[in-house]
Amino acid sequence: MSLPRCPRTRTVMFSRTLTRCYPQRTLWIAILCVICSWTLSTAGATTIRDKEVKPDAPQDLTAIPVKAEAIVLTWKKPLKGQTDGYIVVYCLKRNKGNGCERQKIEGGNVTEVEVTNLYANHTYQFQVQSWYSDHPKGASTGYIEASGTPPIPPTLRRNFKGLVEKSLGFEHKIPCPVKADPRPYTRWLKNGTDLTPNDPDDNVSFTKTSIVFKRLRFSDAGLYTCVASNFFGQPIHVNFTLIVVDTHSESYAESSVLESFSSLELETGPYNETEEEETHFPRFTDTERMEPEKPLPSNTKVRLECGARGTPTPNITWIKDGVQKWKINVIRPTRVEEKGFVLIIRRAIVRDTGKYTCIVSNQYGTIEHTYDVKIRERLPVKPIMSPMKNVTATVGSNTSFVCRVVNDLTPHFAWMRFNGTNNTKQRLTDIDDHISILQQRWVEEPMLTCDEFLDVFYQNQSKRMLECLHLIQLETQGGMEEANQLKLYNVQYEDEGPYLCVAGNFYGMSWEGAYLDVVEPTTQAPVRTNPPAVYIPNNMQPTSKTQLIIFSVVGFVVVLILVTCIAILCKQTQVRHRRPSDKPDISGPKHLYRQTSVDSTQSIAPLFGGRNRLTSSLTVISEYDIPLDPEWEFPRDRLTVGKTIGEGAFGKVVIGEAVGIVCQEKTSTVAVKMLKANAMDREFSDLISELAMMKMIGKNPNIINLLGCCTQEGPPYVIVEFAHHGNLRDFLRSRRPPEEYEKSILLTTSQTLTNKDLMSMAYQVARGMDFLASKKCIHRDLAARNVLVTEDFEMKICDFGLARDIHYIDFYRKTTDGRLPVKWMAPEALFDRMFTTQSDVWSFGILLWEIMTLGGTPYPSVPVEQMFDYLRSGKRLEKPQNTSLEIYHILCECWRTSPGQRPTFCELVEDLDRIISVSSNQDYLDLEAVGDAPVKTFQESERMAFMGFRAPLSPQVYYKVPQTRDCCPYAN
C-alpha cells in the first residue's frame, strides 16, 4: 500500500509512514491501538478469572412505601442458601449525596429489608448487591428510585387569585402559589424579564419558593410570573399582578373591589416614616377588568370602569371619539351617568357605538384608557353552541377543551368542573335541572364571574358539586388563551371527569360538557410517581468467556476498519491537493469579503478573502506547498521586476515587464505584488488567499485583473494590471488649480476636468462594484485611494494588499481587530461591525464626494474619536460646491441610516448613466471652489439634522428612478 507523496513502504512500515506524512493524525491512531491492546489483554485476564464461581445477582428488585420515612425493598434469587455470603443495600438521596446508611446483611437467604430514617417526601435511589466472601466482586441489581410518599408535580393552588394589593413601605413576602413534592425550583419574572438573585437591586431577595420585598415601592408594581418545576411533570407558569397602595394617604380613589391572596401568609415590618415618600402619580387599580373591546347587543347596559388612585385624588374626564362635549348629542342624555370612575350607559343603542376614553390626571401626571364600544342590533337569541368532544389524555401530558358558539353573538364564557368522581358521567345529563334557576339572573347581569355564578347556583350552600376553573393559569408562549379554550397542563388522574363550558348573553345561557379520560402512558416513562418503582436493567459485567472473546474480536475489527478509513481519507486529501480545481467551488449564497490586517493603516489587506483567516506563528514564514495551477502560473525567467511603486511594513508592489503574459512574445508592463524578507505567516496566507479569490472572481474592465502568478521555486509573486496614472485620489488632486503664487511661475499642463468626466469616473466605479456585488464579494475599503487610473483613463478598483503605512492614522481607528477606515465606513459597520454590500454603497457615497471635491478629505474638521457620535446623531457631509442637487440626492440616498433604504449598485449604475447621457462636455467645473471641505463644515453640520433627510430635487432633474430595476449586464 502506498500513500500520496510518501515513500513506498511495506506493511510493517505503515505506522512510520503515516506518522511522518500525517503527524496530526498520529495521536488518534495511537489511541486506537491502545484500545485494541487493552481489549485483547482484558479477554486473556478474564479467561483466568472466569474459572472462579461468581454469585448470582438479585432479581426483580421492588420498593414499597410503608410510611413517609420508610420503604421496604424486596428481591428474588438470594445466594442459594449459602451461609458465607452476604447482601449489601445501597441507598442514595437523589442528587443530594448520601441520604441513608449502607446496610450489610449477613446470610444469603434474605429477600427483604426495611430502610428507615428517610426524609419524608424525598426521592431515593436503591441498589442491592450479593457477595461471596472468597470472591473479589459482587453481583448487583440496577438502581431504582422510590420515595416514602408519591411525588407531586407542580400544581396551581385551588384558591389562587390573580390580583395582589400590598401596602407601600412595608416588608412583604409573596410565595409562589404552587404545590409540589419535591419542593419545586422557582424562577421569577417581572413584566416578562427574568429576576435573578444577582440583580443589583438589594430591595428584592428570593427564598426557595418566595419573592421578598424589604420595603415595597411604587416601582415594584407590575405583572409577576412564577415558573415552578421539579423532576416530575411539566413546569407551570403562574401570573399575578402586584398593586402597591399607600395606606397612610387619606385620599383613596373609588374603584372595583380588589382580589388578593386569602390563603398566603405574609410577613410585614414597620413602616419607616423618616424616609422620603414617593410621588403618588395616578395609576389604574384593576387593569384586568379594563378590556379594550366592548361588543354588546342593543338595549343593554354598558359599564366602563377606570378605577384609579393617586395623591392628590385624580380627576377623571370622559371623551367620545376625541370630542369632550359629546353628551349633548346623546339621545336621552339621562341614560348616561358617571359614578366616580365608572361610566354607565343604560339601554344602549347603535348610535352609542364609539371609542370612549377616560383621562385620569392630577398634578403629578396623566393616564388614559380607551374602550372600543360596539353596539349592534342583533336577534334576541341565546348562544347556540356546538357539541364538545370528549378527550383522552395520558398522565403528565397537556390537553385542552374548545367551546364554540355558532351564532353571531359575543357571549361571556365560564368554565367549570365537577368535584369528586362518583357517577360524574351521569351528572352531565342532570345539569339542565340545576342550571335553569340561573336564567333570570344571567339576563339581568350577563358578565357574572364564575364564582358569582356558583354563588347564585348553590345559594351559599357549603357543599358544591361544581368548582370554577380560573383562566389565569392558562398561559402559553403566545400569551393568554382565548376565553373559549380551556387548556390543562400536566394532567393527573385526579383531573379525570366532566368539564362544563357555560356561555351566556342578555337573552339567555347555554352549556355544553365533555369528559376527560386519563390513561397511563403507552411507553413507560422514567420513574416519577409512587412505587412500585420502575426496574432499571442490570449493568453487570459479562460472565461468559464466549462473550468476552466475541467483544474482543469485534473491537479489533472496529479498530482495523477505522485505521483503513483514515488511510483512505489521507489518500483522497492528498489527491485533491495535488490536482486542485481551476476555480474554488462556491455553492449557495456564500458571501466573500475583504479582510483587514491587524496592523493595517492604509488599505493594504487582500482585496478578497474567505471568512476564516489563517493564523500561525508570527516569527518566520512557513514553507507552504502551493499547488501548481497551469492556467495562471507564469515562468519566472520571462518576468523582469523593476522599481518599487508601493511599499509597506511587510510587502511591496513593484513595476515589472512580462514577456508573453498578454500576447505571445510581446512585452507588457505589469504590477507585481511580493513579500518582504520580514513578512510573517499571516501575510503569506493573505497573499495566497487574495490570489485564489482573484482567480475565482474573473475579469472585468473596472477591476484590476489578475494576469498571472509565480508560486513555484521561489517567493510568491502576484502579477496584475499596471495603472499608469496611479490612484484616483492623487489623480484628482493633480488636476486642482495651483495656488496664487504658483500661477505666475508654473504652466498648468493638467487636462481640465468637466462634470461629465467626474460622472464617468463615478459610473465606472459603480459598474465595478456592481460586478463584485454580483459575485457576492464585499470590498470593505472602497475609497478613491483604492481606485487606479489607467493610461486610457479607465477606473479600476484595486487594493495593493501588502503596501501599508503603519504610522498613518487618518483613515483608520485602532481596534482589537485592526485599524479601520472610519471615515468611509457605514454606521452599522462602525457600531455593530456588520459589513454588507449596502455598507459598500455608503463607502461609494464617500468616494463620490471625493470625486466631486477633486480628492477632498471627508470630515476634515471632525476628529476620528468623534465620528461615532457624529454619525449616530444623524449628521452627514454637506453638498460640495458646484455639485447639482441630483448628484447630492444620490449622495444622500447612499448615506441612509437604514441599509435597506440605500440604493443598490445596479441602481447607481443606471442613475449615473442617465446623468452622463444628458450632460454636456462644456459643463466645466469652477476649479477655484473644489478641494477639501471648509473648516466650518463640522460646525455647520451640527445644525443639520440629517436623520431621514431627503434632498429636494431641482426643477432640472433629468431622470426618474424607476420603482423596479433589472440587473445590470457585465463584461466578462
Curated annotation (Swiss-Prot):
Residues 44-547 are extracellular. It catalyses: L-tyrosyl-[protein] + ATP = O-phospho-L-tyrosyl-[protein] + ADP + H(+). Residues 1-43 form the signal peptide. Residues 569-972 are cytoplasmic. Pfam families: fn3 (PF00041), I-set (PF07679), Ig_3 (PF13927), PK_Tyr_Ser-Thr (PF07714). Belongs to the protein kinase superfamily. Tyr protein kinase family. Fibroblast growth factor receptor subfamily. This is Fibroblast growth factor receptor. It comes from Strongylocentrotus purpuratus (Purple sea urchin).
